[in-house]
UniProtKB/Swiss-Prot annotation:
A Gene Ontology biological process term: translation
Subunit structure: Part of the 50S ribosomal subunit.
Originating organism: Helicobacter pylori (strain ATCC 700392 / 26695)
PROSITE patterns: RIBOSOMAL_L24
PANTHER family associated with the record: MITOCHONDRIAL RIBOSOMAL PROTEIN L24 (PTHR12903)
Similarity annotation: Belongs to the universal ribosomal protein uL24 family.
Record-level GO cellular component terms: ribonucleoprotein complex; ribosome
Protein purpose: One of two assembly initiator proteins, it binds directly to the 5'-end of the 23S rRNA, where it nucleates assembly of the 50S subunit. One of the proteins that surrounds the polypeptide exit tunnel on the outside of the subunit.
The gene coding this protein: rplX
Lineage: Bacteria, Pseudomonadati, Campylobacterota, Epsilonproteobacteria, Campylobacterales
Secreted listed as a keyword: no
Protein name: Large ribosomal subunit protein uL24
Length: 73
């Protein structure tokens, strides 16, 4: 599906928990018709301990949302 929304565009979220937020597009996923928007749909993800990070812990990461839930601002 062809989309007007590209990476680094400024968009407004029109549906969901983050409705009304204006933010930058970090990635576009054309196969699934989804976009990753900066600061929207943030989840807390557990990280297992590794050699680089011996304690492990949690990180906050943006999850994709459907492209129909955003419009260009």
């Amino acid at each position: 599906m062809k989309s007007e929304i590209k990476k680094n565009d400024i968009v407004k979220v029109i549906a969901g928990d983050d409705k009304g937020k204006v933010a930058k597009v970090l990635a576009v996923l054309p196969k699934t018709s989804q976009v990753v928007v900066e600061g929207c749909k943030v989840v807390k993800k557990a990280i297992k301990p590794t050699d680089d990070n011996p304690k492990g812990g949690f990180i906050h990461k943006e999850k994709p949302m459907h492209i129909s839930n955003v419009k260009k601002a």
